[in-house]
Amino acid sequence: MKKVILSLALGTFGLGMAEFGIMGVLTELAHNVGISIPAAGHMISYYALGVVVGAPIIALFSSRYSLKHILLFLVALCVIGNAMFTLSSSYLMLAIGRLVSGFPHGAFFGVGAIVLSKIIKPGKVTAAVAGMVSGMTVANLLGIPLGTYLSQEFSWRYTFLLIAVFNIAVMASVYFWVPDIRDEAKGNLREQFHFLRSPAPWLIFAATMFGNAGVFAWFSYVKPYMMFIS
């Protein structure tokens, strides 16, 4: 069981690197590609768009394929998206790379939680999910500074090349450590949004939207702000 949790935690670490790593390389990216810093900041939004679009769509396939195969597909998208971003030299291709790399983000957390709920004893599921999510925290503590260092010493492309290669290792860990199980629950896209008929979810959405907007409005441009304004 520990290997399953570790595999999923490695996956969330890679997702955290991809999501937040862009913030530490924003100025280098803008200079290298020949776009403005605000335009480079759009890459953060494209990733977020991929997260929003990807999660509900992937959920539709949770009953058609094994959860292990879905996880492998999601991590493969991480590899492809970050590789595309690494090799891109135009705004359009950068945007597509970020969109693809963001697509599996929300779905990975959801599918990973389902896997853990099926193989972990009921009283320990919460701790197991926390272990999976800890990969994101470690990415913020260790991964992002490493990515920023690589960008400053070599190139921002090395940062995202590292993320792509790391996700290949994540695919191997999922293949060997995650059991081949299925989620038999049936559903369709419309059913996923039935809960929006009540006002309570909209209040939660508003709170999280404005809260995250406040954080990311500062966090996204913290490097150019510290370099050119403070």
Question: Language-model segments: which ranges?
Answer:
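Paired small-residue
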Residues: L6, G81-M84, L92-V100
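Structural signature of the two symmetry-related core transmembrane helices
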Residues: H69-A83
